[in-house]
């Protein structure tokens, strides 16, 4: 998880390459493939012979509307084509099934809820969470990296519970 607009991209790139080099045999990366941090990490994972599974926060056609630049959308599609598996998180049950209304709050569920559900999925099914962000949790946005960090903290606090699985380590 991380910022869409990455500062210090060269440092983030180097730290991610070091992470994958030190991680032992290739494994699986789960990623939303959003522009910025997600795409950077997915590219490095693929270069490191890891499998990448795309976990999309909503149906593909709707998710593609969130890419603000043509180059980012093209990069997303190229990465998606290299993914081992693609999972689309279903729309929250309170969202009108007319996909065009997902951006409008309806019964308390918004587009941000779909990103929050992506964060929950990643925290539940990931053992190590990589966070590429500024570290500011003072004003978490729904579904943003700060909220994902708080979800990770809650999961780590429960890690001694045999019923709890998911994140066991967070790297910032």
Name each model feature, range by range.
Residues 1-172:
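Acidic/glycine-enriched connector segments
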């Amino acid at each position: 998880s991380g910022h869409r607009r990455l500062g210090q991209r060269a440092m983030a790139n180097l730290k991610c390459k070091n992470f994958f080099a030190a991680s032992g045999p290739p494994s699986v990366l789960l990623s939303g493939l959003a522009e910025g941090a997600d795409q950077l990490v997915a590219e490095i994972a693929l270069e490191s012979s890891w499998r990448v599974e795309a976990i999309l926060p909503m149906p593909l056609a709707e998710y593609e509307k969130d890419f603000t630049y043509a180059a980012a959308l093209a990069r997303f599609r190229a990465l998606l084509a290299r993914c081992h598996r693609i999972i689309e998180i279903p729309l929250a049950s309170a969202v009108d099934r007319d996909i065009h209304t997902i951006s409008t709050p309806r019964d308390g569920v918004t587009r941000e809820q779909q990103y929050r559900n992506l964060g929950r999925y990643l925290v539940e099914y990931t053992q190590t969470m990589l966070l590429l962000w500024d570290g500011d949790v003072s004003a978490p946005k729904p579904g943003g990296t700060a909220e994902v960090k708080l979800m990770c903290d809650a999961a780590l606090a429960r890690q001694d519970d045999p019923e709890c699985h998911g994140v066991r380590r967070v790297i910032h």
